[in-house]
């Protein structure tokens, strides 16, 4: 029901072609990578696209498909920037229905939810915040044995800077 609800949100905003594209991406990723996930291994994927090309919308579709297929918890990483983290959190709240949506200060909400609804936690890539949430996950009995689906919405911040590397 999560993917269907998300696609309806997109289509209701008048963007039927985007909804169709998201559906196709989510189905492809779901069938090729999520359906046979062992829940014991680590899988890494990459969604490529130009700046402002709709990658976040496609990523939301993949999250919804994964929730439909039984994944209970998602961490959505943003750049270590308060404004970007808040913008992403607000977009998740506006676009994705039926999830327990948490910001970095919502550990109580996450714990109270106990994965009754799939949870999406939107976090900055900040060591202090990530350690805090690692402790939250480790201390809750309900996360034990459950997969955590981690999505990096700002992979440009995932690599080391090449500003001073001598490249032209």
Regions found by a protein language model. Name each.
Residues 1-168:
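RecA-like P-loop NTPase motor core of helicase/translocase proteins
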């Amino acid at each position: 029901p999560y993917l269907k609800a998300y696609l309806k949100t997109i289509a209701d905003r008048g963007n039927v072609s985007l909804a169709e594209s998201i559906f196709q991406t989510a189905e492809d990723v779901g069938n090729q990578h999520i359906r046979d996930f062992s829940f014991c291994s680590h899988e890494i994927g990459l969604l490529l696209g130009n700046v402002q090309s709709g990658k976040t919308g496609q990523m939301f579709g993949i999250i919804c498909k994964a929730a439909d297929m039984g994944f209970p918890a998602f961490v959505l990483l943003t750049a270590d920037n308060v404004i970007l983290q808040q913008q992403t959190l607000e977009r998740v709240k506006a676009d994705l229905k039926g999830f327990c949506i948490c910001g970095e200060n919502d550990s109580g909400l996450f714990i109270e939810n106990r994965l009754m609804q799939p949870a999406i936690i939107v976090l900055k890539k900040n060591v202090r915040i990530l350690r805090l949430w690692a402790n939250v996950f480790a201390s809750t009995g309900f996360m034990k044995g459950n997969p955590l689906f981690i999505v990096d919405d700002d992979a440009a911040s995932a690599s080391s800077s090449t500003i001073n590397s001598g490249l032209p």
